[in-house]
Amino acid sequence: LINPARISEMMQLFKSNLKIPVDFHTHCTPGYGLGAVLSAIVHGVDIVDTNIWNFAGGPAAPAIELIYIFCKKLGIELDVNMEAVAKINKELYTIRKELEAYDAVKQFPNPFNPLTDTLPANIDKLFDDAIAAAKSNNEEALLEACHAIEAYFNFPKPNELVKKAEVPGGMYTNMVAQLKQLNSMDILEDAMKLIP
């Protein structure tokens, strides 16, 4: 869990001191994911990890479809077949529905295909605002724009408990699943406070 300001500094250090490709992986749970990935891209990352739309956001990595829009606006070519991604996304929707009993989030993003759907002007501008904020290292404006983008598409809101405890997405969703099995969700907030 890394905020955009920190990844901006780290990318500059990595790129000036390492001779190997840099791969950035994060989760969206605390609200940093999309902004941190954009910051990493703007500051020269070689590879970013993403998820396909219906499995993205929340405790997962940012959606490749959103990263595709950012990269297109930045003139960065992705070596990804987005038509195949759209087909896979349809299958993943069905799979996620089948696994609903195990889904910690139970919130699906609004349907969207960046190859066929047109963004409203105000949402398209949010992508431009986020890019400008990432380039100028304005973390507050970057997170504001990214959170507005995620809200428009109905991705989960940042989880303040996770943000404060700095718990990775997978650890958080596993803990929630275990507490649900024990009928002990009432202790989640206290449990999160105990995590160093």
Task: Pin down the residues of each PLM region.
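Catalytic cores and adjacent flexible loops of soluble metabolic enzymes
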Residues: 1-196
